[in-house]
């Protein structure tokens, strides 16, 4: 079908129009950031339905997330409705309104699940399977690995013994287990995991593959050796211009001869490189040499710098690539082959046993979804099955969003259900490889890259490629600067794709022509002498200043109206690679009273509040773990001081465990009595919680801990309180999820958490801020993908890349397999193997490439203006970055591969554009006119030196004086000295009042007097009983299950607050109508109606008290009060007390001139056998006598009239006080 001609005036660009209508072959749409790919995808679906008459359920639309799927289905449904309204007689559109609900617009996992549910018989599995929870899956896999390793310990194969010697430590085999897990997850990301594992040994056995790895390293070495030779020659040229440096030149000439031999004939002689020493030490530059070359001081420094660079580049090649002869590297591969083969065997055993366990429990995980789907769709020889053929016949087209984030299993599934080859297929793919940032999810961008390079713009003989390059999001300054940076940063060698004219961004948004340059702000840290703040804290304060400047000076352009409005908090986002800076930023913004939110899902287990709860759980599980026991003791909950812990240990210095020391201290006659009482209370809590944990699930134990110690309330009051509270809820919810698995108990839950920590798996805060809340946001680049903001502050640019994975004993790669060092068991020495060296080099290249893509995502989030924040310790390092070598249009490959952080590259590229002092051979262009408009950067570079006002010296040391110094001074006015001493010695007369709360609720006062009567100290109550306030219920508890008693109490109070009082009384029907009215007004939620105790309310309506209130002259409901406690003087007081009492009285009515108050109680109580109603009434009155007395005295104080009161118990009746 041909593409329809584009009418005049349509909103679509030519490339978008082609993307909507192109058909007849596989299509890959390379959609740059902000190019409207989602709108294009939706429009293509709509035109398939409207123009081509295709039923919506004959389209398979695959999205990356469930949220994306829901949004896309909603947008398609809306468009179908609009079309149906415009053409009500269209039967096809009416059918689509029905079929949209069955439409396959979902994630690939959801599609696979439906496939399994429909064809479970092919798999021979029980159709009543369920999806395992994350907790269950992790623990089951961990259990499986334990069992499989134990089996192999029984066999004790020599290769297994060597493996454990190499990959386990003296203390544990945790590292060995971790490697097995990693291999398992890598393998199941392949269409045939077993085959992938079997091929791991191939490079260790076959010389042909070893030769390929040697060549890979040689090619990479050539990059660094060539750069080293260039640096050496530059050093020689510079020294040649100077006097008195003959010895220096002689050293360099020797090095040049060695390097010439290595590079002889244009090839790298690896044997010569490994067999000789390079980088001889240069003679010192003496004062005489400096004097002789006083006019060339800079050249002298440059010469030394170039020789230093030469040495570092050669050292990298010799240490990272060829630390030994190539033949030795190959020989080690043969020795490692049996170990690699046996490791693959263990992982296959784990896979087999893990699958067996899942089948026995009738559970599936997400990996099963994909592999079972493949099993359904393929025959044993890998060809499409009959079921696959039926899906090929059914689906008119398959549309894949975010194609750059697919893995090889998903690619295989898609290939089974698509029709034709690339030149005549029905697969439509949309994505941007420059935004492929999910390597940790096994995303494989090479799938996109292979098609991008293979498909052509005309689609001749293969698939068709369409480039969507016009950006409708950002101002031209953001786009041109981004283009300039990536034009010189990204290519096939580093970045995996060339950033050429087809890849760059083109301006397409209707902004005005006002100037909005990108701002690169370089913060030079103040040293410890000039600031008490760390470098990170200085950067956080600096960011706040940028935000304040934006709010004060910047405007946001409204493209619809063509007018400006003032910038608000929500217009600003701070992007960072991770959340490491979150707490510093929270503090800095709090200091300036600027609303700020971090939706952190990283570093979760490092948060103070989470560490506290985990220490509690670990201490309850096993109090012999000193770190967690002492951590709990030192926490805000128990508040043991360091000197108290020291006292405990001093009396028992030789105990193995601190718990033993506590017990011994309690029993020691020399122990401090107060500390002993405190310890007894602590141990009593521990034992109580241990007993509780035996009979209750983990989430109830956590809930009890939260309630007992008011954990939620405490952390809610700290900086970032909403996020901290969400973190605590997150842990509680995880315990619920754990409880729903087949595992139970505190020990297993802790093991589950340990596994999450080991895998770096975070599940942090719920999103406590909505998209329209007016706050400054901080988020990671990953979480910002797909979003846009008027002002983007991209900070943390100077934080180094995380290269931890490159230091692991085993390097994994989907394409190449497994790289392992050679470990000599007899000598207990490890050596780099050919595979470990080669795969590490490949991994480093891929890591830097993905970091570049993260930078691209960050830069392209900005609409109005982009701020880049870098930080250096001194400005000398900037000069080095300006001097980075280039190769053609790019920063040299060796510089990019060894770049430590994004700032290293960004500053180097932009400074080369602006600095006039940089030599032409280090610039990309000699004249700005050479740059195309689309990539001509508009950037302001500012270098700011941090100044910390808080540490400025106000007084010299000799200006400080103490009271004692004043007394010893022999001169001066005695009257003035006496007056100063009086001021400094002044004692505040009401110091006791500072130890009491300034405001107390009636409930707190009630509790205080109750505890005093029972012998509990007031300080203890204040420390642990902050005032009753239940924390918000997690979402899953609010939506299902039974409500707690206190929640039902609140609900009943809400109903009673609005209850009408009529002399004729209201009927049960009217009561239901009244409740429905509360729901309609959103006073209460609809799902709460079932928990309202209608019979108890009807009992109250039929009571004498209801009639009395109905006949009253005046009725006041829910009356709050705040009163000075000193005025309420009818209860026993100590010294004059100026505390404030606050409370809420349920109802007050006036009858015959007398004021009465009513307090509703929903308490449940035990009616002991033989107790009369009168005895129960007396018992209930005594329970609330203090609270009621406060209410009565408070009202009498306020009203200056006699006040009487009623208690109404829904489960007992009326009590008059």
Curated annotation (Swiss-Prot):
It holds the Pfam family PDDEXK_1. CDD domains: DEXQc_UvrD (cd17932). It comes from the Bacteria. One of its GO terms (biological process) is double-strand break repair via homologous recombination. It comes from Staphylococcus aureus (strain MRSA252). The lineage of its organism: Bacteria, Bacillati, Bacillota, Bacilli, Bacillales. GO terms for cellular component: cytosol; DNA helicase complex. InterPro entries: AddA, DNA_helicase_UvrD-like_C, DNA_helicase_UvrD/REP, P-loop_NTPase, PDDEXK-like_dom_sf, PDDEXK_AddAB-type, Restrct_endonuc-II-like, UvrD-like_ATP-bd. PROSITE patterns: UVRD_HELICASE_ATP_BIND (PS51198), UVRD_HELICASE_CTER (PS51217). Belongs to the helicase family. AddA subfamily. Heterodimer of AddA and AddB/RexB. Residues 10-475 form the UvrD-like helicase ATP-binding domain. This is ATP-dependent helicase/nuclease subunit A. The gene is addA.
